[in-house]
UniProtKB/Swiss-Prot annotation:
Subcellular location: Secreted
Maturation-removed propeptide residues: 18-41
Main location: secreted
Swiss-Prot/TrEMBL keywords: Disulfide bond, Knottin, Secreted, Signal, Toxin
Domain notes: The presence of a 'disulfide through disulfide knot' structurally defines this protein as a knottin.
Protein family according to the UniProt entry: Belongs to the conotoxin O1 superfamily.
InterPro entries for this protein: Conotoxin
The protein's name in its UniProt record: Conotoxin AbVIB
Domain of life of the organism encoding this protein: Eukaryota
Cysteine disulfide links: 43-57, 50-61, 56-68
Organism of this sequence: Conus abbreviatus (Abbreviated cone)
Signal peptide: 1-17
């Protein structure tokens, strides 16, 4: 009887985990779309602010001044 109960509970957990992962997959797709839209935005011109994730048009960020190089 105990073995049957354990198998039943395991099956319930697997079914719940599968359903949850499907919901998360939708959110992952949305996050991926959001990330792609950020990557397609325009670059920061020289003198503009840049940081750890610089998107400078010149591909060069002066970390000390936190500005994009020319």
């Amino acid at each position: 009887v105990i073995i049957i109960a354990v198998l039943f509970l395991t099956a319930c957990q697997l079914t719940t985990a599968e359903t949850s992962s499907r919901g998360k997959q939708k959110h992952r797709a949305l996050r991926s779309t959001d990330k792609n839209s950020k990557l397609t935005r325009g670059c920061t011109p020289p003198g503009g602010a840049c940081g750890g994730h610089a998107h400078c048009c010149s591909q060069s960020c002066d970390i000390l001044a936190s500005t994009c190089n020319a």
